[in-house]
Amino acid sequence: MAVFNQKSVSDMIKEFRKNWRALCNSERTTLCGADSMLLALQLSMAENNKQHSGEFTVSLSDVLLTWKYLLHEKLNLPVENMDVTDHYEDVRKIYDDFLKNSNMLDLIDVYQKCRALTSNCENYNTVSPSQLLDFLSGKQYAVGDETDLSIPTSPTSKYNRDNEKVQLLARKIIFSYLNLLVNSKNDLAVAYILNIPDRGLGREAFTDLKHAAREKQMSIFLVATSFIRTIELGGKGYAPPPSDPLRTHVKGLSNFINFIDKLDEILGEIPNPSIAGGQILSVIKMQLIKGQNSRDPFCKAIEEVAQDLDLRIKNIINSQEGVVALSTTDISPARPKSHAINHGTAYCGRDTVKALLVLLDEEAANAPTKNKAELLYDEENTIHHHGTSILTLFRSPTQVNNSIKPLRERICVSMQEKKIKMKQTLIRSQFACTYKDDYMISKDNWNNVNLASKPLCVLYMENDLSEGVNPSVGRSTIGTSFGNVHLDRSKNEKVSRKSTSQTGNKSSKRKQVDLDGENILCDNRNEPPQHKNAKIPKKSNDSQNRLYGKLAKVAKSNKCTAKDKLISGQAKLTQFFRL
């Protein structure tokens, strides 16, 4: 029964391909088998739940219930007394839009289009709605499942089952590459192979591509191709903005697009479809097993599937050439073939595309998977080793606080704010490493002092009072970084007034008094001590000379005390500036 139904479905698909110009808009329209139809329905229901409840998820029971109702409704079979989930009309609309945007048709659409051809109805009347329903629902497995339950599980049967799963996985991956090569709008194919082999394009990259495709109303693959072409071929004026989320996936997307370009190049440059098909499968095989252990079951499965499909392509091409030879025996050699202009010679590789379409149609006509839960929710069924199910891949990462910005963008903004806070507000000179931090004047201390009431040197002296007080002398002193001079408060005021009168408008700069080789440093509030000499005019009176003598004595008496605060290399640097 199952073989009969599968053969009937294959004949229906062949009839559809013969009349594709009257039934669809593009020759490269691909078909959804039973498994792909179920996956598309699952994604449609999850999208509908997200719109109504905010969660992109759906239970297996709801999917199977809606699947049964969908088959009966599309085949115009009675749906009375059948349960249906809420918002079924919305789910059906999302499902139809998904297939339309992906340039795909399901098997029920093919059946309905073929039924619409009144001239060839007798050719496919053998397919009835009930037969197609049994084929899509997998009722032919009912007896087999009951007999399998009585058979105990052995290590050999488990090993064979695992090998079968790996074979199905390898077959699905290679067919996804071929499907994308024929139909660039197939989002399901992109979801399967975007990160196989590992290109660093995980769930986040697929989510960014999906959002960009929805915004531009394009397919996921075309959005990725457009982005990479803009970066590679466009100038600065055409480059994507730095805020584009796809910029973080440039390397992986470029690797993926360049690989598909290599397959397109083989498809367009090799006129022989048999050779072209073999090379395409060989390139895909080498890409998948590159860097893998040759003894790995996945690598063995890839090699076996590629060899089997290569042989199948050659058989398809041989059968097509035989049909063409029989149909053109009564045509004169001088007479051109039908539809040769703008069809057969429009682009090189059309024969290869036809062969690949036949191969994809045969895959769509295969019986559905027995285990629906494994097909829809198994993480390892989709991607080898580090897999993610199709439902999880299409689900966007959860955002906190109902933020519309992606998680990556919010993290970048937070990191930028931290960098701004970490910037130093204190500007130091290139010689700041030679001064001790305890001699630096803090900004808070300056804000607490009335600048209009006291001179600059007096403010510096008062700020350093807690650090530079000499109990033996009994008065406040200024502990400079390299001058080692201690002055009386009243004398400091006189000297600072004289220095201020000499500098004039340069009062905002750093001031320094050079007294007999000893320096007095008056610093700005945010600047480290620097060396600017302010010469004091010589006085002829004896009182001034006595003042200088006292200053020199005080400096010599406190020289040892100040040396204790020197750091390594400071004495040499001080001697250099004295010269």
From Swiss-Prot:
GO terms for cellular component: chromatin; cytoplasm; nucleoplasm. Coiled coil: none annotated. GO terms for biological process: DNA repair; negative regulation of double-strand break repair via homologous recombination. Keywords: Cytoplasm, DNA damage, DNA repair, DNA-binding, Nucleus. Residues 486-496 have a biased composition (Basic and acidic residues). It is found in: Cytoplasm; Nucleus. Residues 480-543 are annotated as: Disordered. SUPFAM superfamilies: P-loop containing nucleoside triphosphate hydrolases. Restricted to testis. Overexpressed in multiple cancer cells. The keyword Ubl conjugation does not apply. GO terms for molecular function: DNA binding. Interacts with RAD51 and PCNA. Interacts with PARP1. Interacts with TASOR. Belongs to the PARI family. Required to suppress inappropriate homologous recombination, thereby playing a central role DNA repair and in the maintenance of genomic stability. Antagonizes homologous recombination by interfering with the formation of the RAD51-DNA homologous recombination structure. Binds single-strand DNA and poly(A) homopolymers. Positively regulate the poly(ADP-ribosyl)ation activity of PARP1; however such function may be indirect. Although it shares some sequence similarity with SRS2 yeast helicase, does not contain a functional ATPase domain suggesting it has no helicase activity. This is PCNA-interacting partner. It comes from Homo sapiens.
